[in-house]
Amino acid sequence: MSDLPLAQAHGRFIRGSASKVRRVLDQIRGRTYRDALIMLEFMPYRSTGPITKVLRSAVANAENNLGMDPSSLIIKTASADMGPSMKRYRPRAQGRAFAIKKQTCHISIAVAPSNQSTTTEASD
């Protein structure tokens, strides 16, 4: 395991299913901060908005709390876990009601400095 510090951010109780959020997180995991922002901007999914907010928060934590350079950060971990479901009811014919589950999820993103920048500094 590497000894590089990680900066994390969490978005909790985000409306949307965890599986749909994971579909986007799988695309940006391991990429640089700049590449991830560009990808998120042009993806046609609704979950890119909350993911962008959590990613920017993780980078702000890295910059302010750990003094890292945002241009050298890569996304180390990105995960989405299921949150509680909000239960709603839709009225139907003859006095019946159908249950509707509005799913939520928790988004976690951790960023770390890329190994390329640290190895080039060490070799100089």
Curated annotation (Swiss-Prot):
PROSITE patterns hit by this protein: RIBOSOMAL_L22
Record has RNA-binding as a keyword: yes
The transmembrane segments are: none
> Could you name the Gene Ontology cellular component terms for this entry?
cytosolic large ribosomal subunit
**Does the keyword rRNA-binding belong to this entry?**
yes
Q: Name one GO biological process term.
A: translation
Instruction: Tell me a Gene Ontology molecular-function term this record carries.
Output: rRNA binding
What protein family is recorded?
Belongs to the universal ribosomal protein uL22 family.
The annotated subunit structure for this chain is: Part of the 50S ribosomal subunit.
What name does the UniProt record give this protein?
Large ribosomal subunit protein uL22
Q: Which gene encodes it?
A: rplV
